[in-house]
């Protein structure tokens, strides 16, 4: 397996830019900057796309512009066009059940209530893609989930989320090389609670 497509989940537009639900977009923006990518709107892919090279591997970066709950349409269109299999896709998304400051990677699994993943699984008809889960924490009983994810994190939470994103960027080359055991261990060592 070699990752050929990295998708950051989020909602398009200025109103959503700094919301917790957009950490996937934040990751893709930072990765594009790191590898000299320049996002362009591609209507046939229902998103913004750029191509980067990591270790001579061409990798498509995608930020769907379909809004979170319809992300699968965008992912399917680019995967079909470039003939990318599900196990060659890494989806980066916010994760309620992980504390801010923590990032985890895994293959497969359920959508865990995440509507972007739920739609992607439905459209692709598989769970066999990789996920980079960026912890945003859970509001508990303080706030409805939708209000929590569609809101900006506190300064402390933002610092921790940014740290998890930076740690994830540092291991992306190992992700591309398929050194997932190393990635898992490295991310565990860098957890900030």
Curated annotation (Swiss-Prot):
Its EC number is 3.1.1.29. SUPFAM superfamilies: Peptidyl-tRNA hydrolase-like. The record marks 11 as: Discriminates between blocked and unblocked aminoacyl-tRNA. InterPro entries: Pept_tRNA_hydro, Pept_tRNA_hydro_CS, Pept_tRNA_hydro_sf. Keywords: Cytoplasm, Hydrolase, RNA-binding, tRNA-binding. GO terms for cellular component: cytoplasm. Signal peptide: none annotated. It is found in: Cytoplasm. Pfam families: Pept_tRNA_hydro. Its main location: cytoplasm. PROSITE patterns: PEPT_TRNA_HYDROL_2 (PS01196). It catalyses: an N-acyl-L-alpha-aminoacyl-tRNA + H2O = an N-acyl-L-amino acid + a tRNA + H(+). The record marks 94 as: Stabilizes the basic form of H active site to accept a proton. TRNA binds at residues 16, 67, 69, 115. The active site is at 21 (proton acceptor). One of its GO terms (biological process) is rescue of stalled ribosome. One of its GO terms (molecular function) is tRNA binding. HAMAP family: Pept_tRNA_hydro_bact (MF_00083). Hydrolyzes ribosome-free peptidyl-tRNAs (with 1 or more amino acids incorporated), which drop off the ribosome during protein synthesis, or as a result of ribosome stalling. Belongs to the PTH family. Monomer. This is Peptidyl-tRNA hydrolase. The gene is pth.
